[in-house]
Design a protein with these regions (language model features):
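Structure-specific nucleic-acid interaction/processing domains
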Residues: 2-155
Length: 155
């Protein structure tokens, strides 16, 4: 597959690393993006997609046998959380149409807004999908919006 996608941009400026994001949001956790698909031959805008991407992944790592054996308190937790940078630089989308047809379109990847936590990120994505009318228009490839919010945990 050839690389038909652009670098990520935010307000017209290229975003190449996390430091470029931290200029706008020092405690950035992820972003909401707009992906625009242009016909390679005509340059005509065909589809758009709103999505979200975490720039870090948080994984649960279980301790090995030696680590567990060296623990003073055997009743303690036998795992730790590891946070590392995600694949955001080369990320195309979770949308199957975009992944399957990426070589047929020139793809522009634009960051719309940054977020500092996962709950805020989910809220901003759902709000953007609903406010832009993505679910009512075939021009957008979005299939749905999902959000569960309890209390004042957002923002």
């Amino acid at each position: 597959m050839t690389n038909n996608y652009s670098n990520w941009t935010f307000k017209g400026k290229t975003v190449k690393n996390i430091e470029d994001m931290q200029i706008h949001e020092p405690k950035v956790w992820g972003f909401v993006y707009l992906m625009s698909l242009y016909d390679i031959k005509t340059g005509e805008l065909k589809y758009q997609y709103i999505g979200k991407k975490n720039i870090y992944s948080k994984r649960k790592r279980s301790f090995g046998k030696k680590e567990v054996a060296s623990m003073k308190d055997k009743r303690g937790k036998k795992y730790e959380y590891v946070i590392k940078e995600s694949d955001w630089k080369t990320y195309l989308s979770s949308n199957s149409f975009i992944k399957d047809n990426a070589n047929k379109y020139k793809i522009k990847r634009e960051i719309l807004m940054f977020s500092t936590n996962d709950m805020d990120l989910k809220y901003k994505e759902a709000k953007e999908i609903i406010c832009r009318g993505c679910l009512e228009d075939d021009f957008f490839l979005n299939d749905g919006a999902s959000l569960r919010v309890f209390g004042k945990k957002v923002m």
